[in-house]
Design a protein with these regions (language model features):
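Well-ordered beta-strand positions
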Residues: 88, 128, 132-134, 140, ...
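CoA-thioester-processing core
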Residues: 55-62, 70, 76-130, 144, ...
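C-terminal long alpha-helix characteristic of the crotonase
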Residues: 13, 91-96, 147-194, 207, ...
């Protein structure tokens, strides 16, 4: 299980932020350039043209562990999409704020950040969130359906740890299969591949699979008689 949250409060203004998205000061025509001190002559071209937030989304979506977002402050732009793609979201009642700023800066999340958001809150609310770019409280987000629980700020970490205790107290194989089952309907063939890979791994644990391997290595006919068909 993974708990994902932000540092805070800010040394500059005392405010809290979960994640405020991509730094527009280092956004170029080909993506974001994170290497410090680079110039157009020294920059590694292979590092350009990347939107790192998409890699974060894929990691969260495809890892077998359950990811809980602790929204302790602003979740804006790409940060908003991060909480959307996570498995569960717990938000601070006092400081949790949600705002989709993509259209304000000439950007748009045409993947999980928008389409999966619509799965959570419905098409009308999702379009409102993106088209208007308004600010929403933690209670607003909970009412819409994109936040699981709203708790006092001081209890945010304790609540997440309690959720983690419950999650880790259950079958790890069942939990990972559940995550991939939930994802499968939205993830197309990639989702099917992830689910099928886990199913294959489970099959490899059986005596039946061991017999299939052994008969091949031993160059003999297989004996499937101990393994009846289940109906």
């Amino acid at each position: 299980m993974v708990l994902l949250t932000g540092n805070g409060p800010s040394d500059k203004n005392g405010k809290w932020a979960f994640c405020t998205g991509g730094d527009q000061r280092i956004r170029g025509r080909a993506g974001y350039q994170y290497a410090e001190g680079e110039t157009s002559d020294t920059v590694d071209k292979a590092k350009l043209g990347r939107l790192h937030i998409l890699e974060c989304q894929r990691l969260i979506r495809f890892m077998p562990k359950i990811v809980i977002c602790l929204v302790n402050g602003w979740a804006a732009g790409g940060g908003h999409s991060l909480h959307v793609v996570s498995d569960l979201t717990i938000a601070s009642a006092e400081h949790g704020r949600f705002k989709q700023t993509d259209a304000d800066v000439g950007s748009f999340d045409g993947g999980f950040g928008s389409a999966y958001l619509a799965r959570q809150v419905g098409q009308k609310f999702a379009r409102e969130i993106f088209f208007l770019g308004d600010e929403y409280s933690a209670e607003d987000a909970h009412r819409m359906g994109m936040v699981n629980r709203v708790v006092p700020h001081a209890e945010l970490e304790a609540e997440a740890l309690e959720w983690g205790r419950k999650i880790n107290g259950k079958s790890p194989t069942a939990q990972r299969m559940l995550k991939y089952s939930f994802n499968l309907i939205d993830d197309g063939l990639v989702g099917q591949q992830l689910f099928a890979g886990e199913a294959t791994r489970l099959a490899y644990m059986t005596d039946e699979a061991a017999e299939g391997r052994d008969q091949f290595l031993e160059k003999r006919e297989p004996d499937w008689s101990p393994f009846p068909w289940y109906y």
